[in-house]
């Protein structure tokens, strides 16, 4: 794919023409001298502060503005490391200027930022600041979906760039804030969990508010049924002894009776944290059903209704909803009043579940070996 540039030519020639272009739009302090192979990096850096004409001056065609910013980004890739470290913060700071009435013109910033992020060496540390700027620009324009924000990929990039813990925390916080601003709560929770995972026993105290915020967000989401990963994080463990931790623990390993006892002691907890009692009870019933379904082939209607705190006539609609939410896979035997379990999803996934998975895989491998041996014998018999 060819990249649009301001003019064809060497980097020195491009910077010379860039200076002329910017001078024609008010950058009078730039000189008219020709750039050389020796000084073009310094001259390029001088031009950065005047790049805002690309989105402020309506007389510049949007295509020309995009070509200018793209040319600058492509030349950044050729900069020596020491000049790149100097140039990137200035460039990012300038692109974060969102002054001007025409928000559409700011969209030209995304392509050069992406070009720069992907064009630099994966281990280049300035990619960290470029990605931060990319997130903020995309969030301000409401197009965060145009930026790759998959947490696993972001974590890999941060590792490649050799970012400090503090820098990683800044990225995850920025991602969380951007997702929240755009109403993407599920993605915000994912970013927050990665943020909380960067804290240890010593620094966990600094993440107290974020930990509480994450717990409440997870509990508010009716489709999030796995809580043990968050529960194990140091900032969440730091909250032990506080009502929010006690309440969250109910959804990890508690039941409806524990829930009722908690509300008796803390009657205002739900309203203070914008939690619905009905939604919490429904989620807790789903989690209880998941736990009941582990390692069994069937459940009687009576047993299930008793454990879930439901009337018999309320059970079938609840089970159908649980299947829809993928909390359990089952069939209903309405004649014998039984729930036939065809697939169960563990409420928590700890050491017992890993051991069970290991044993199952070993058993499968053994069975496959038997099948392979039988097929080999059949082939030999047919050949003879």
Swiss-Prot record:
It is found in: Cytoplasm. GO terms for molecular function: translation initiation factor activity. Transmembrane segments: none annotated. Component of the eukaryotic translation initiation factor 3 (eIF-3) complex, which is involved in protein synthesis of a specialized repertoire of mRNAs and, together with other initiation factors, stimulates binding of mRNA and methionyl-tRNAi to the 40S ribosome. The eIF-3 complex specifically targets and initiates translation of a subset of mRNAs involved in cell proliferation. This is Eukaryotic translation initiation factor 3 subunit M. Pfam families: eIF3m_C_helix, PCI. Component of the eukaryotic translation initiation factor 3 (eIF-3) complex. One of its GO terms (cellular component) is eukaryotic translation initiation factor 3 complex, eIF3m. Keywords: Cytoplasm, Initiation factor, Protein biosynthesis. Belongs to the eIF-3 subunit M family. GO terms for biological process: formation of cytoplasmic translation initiation complex. It comes from Schistosoma japonicum (Blood fluke).
């Amino acid at each position: 794919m060819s990249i649009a540039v301001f003019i064809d030519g060497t980097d020195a020639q491009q910077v010379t023409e860039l200076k002329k272009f910017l001078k024609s739009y008010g950058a009078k302090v730039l000189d008219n001298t020709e750039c050389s192979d020796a000084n073009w990096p310094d001259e390029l850096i001088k031009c950065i502060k005047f790049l805002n004409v690309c989105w402020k001056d309506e007389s510049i065609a949007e295509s020309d503005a995009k070509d200018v910013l793209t040319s600058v980004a492509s030349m950044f890739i050729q900069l020596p490391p020491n000049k790149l470290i100097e140039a990137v913060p200035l460039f990012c700071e300038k692109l974060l200027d969102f002054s001007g009435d025409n928000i559409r013109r700011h969209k030209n910033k995304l392509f050069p930022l992406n070009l720069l992020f992907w064009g630099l060496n994966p281990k280049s540390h300035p990619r960290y600041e470029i990605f931060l700027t990319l997130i903020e620009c995309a969030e301000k324009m409401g197009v965060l979906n145009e930026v790759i924000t998959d947490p696993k990929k972001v974590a890999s990039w941060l590792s490649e760039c050799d970012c400090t813990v503090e820098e990683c925390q800044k990225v995850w916080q920025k991602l969380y804030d951007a997702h929240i601003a755009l109403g993407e709560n599920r993605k915000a929770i994912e970013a927050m969990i990665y943020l909380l995972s960067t804290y240890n026993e010593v620094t966990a105290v600094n993440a107290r508010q974020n930990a509480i915020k994450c717990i409440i967000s997870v509990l508010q989401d009716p489709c999030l049924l796995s809580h043990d990963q968050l529960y194990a994080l140091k900032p969440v463990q730091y909250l032990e002894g506080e009502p929010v931790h006690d309440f969250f623990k109910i959804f990890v390993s508690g039941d409806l009776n524990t829930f009722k006892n908690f509300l008796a002691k803390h009657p205002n907890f739900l309203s203070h944290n914008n939690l619905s009692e009905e939604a919490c009870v429904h989620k807790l019933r789903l989690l209880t059903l998941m736990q009941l379904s582990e390692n069994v082939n069937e459940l009687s209607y009576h047993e299930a209704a008793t454990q879930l705190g439901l009337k018999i006539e309320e059970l079938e609609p609840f089970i159908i909803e649980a299947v829809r939410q993928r909390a359990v896979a089952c069939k209903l035997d309405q004649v014998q009043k039984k729930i036939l379990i065809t697939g169960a999803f563990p409420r928590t996934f700890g050491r017992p579940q890993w051991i069970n998975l290991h044993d199952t895989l070993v058993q499968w491998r053994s069975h496959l070996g038997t099948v392979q041996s039988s097929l080999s014998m059949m082939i030999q018999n047919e050949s003879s």
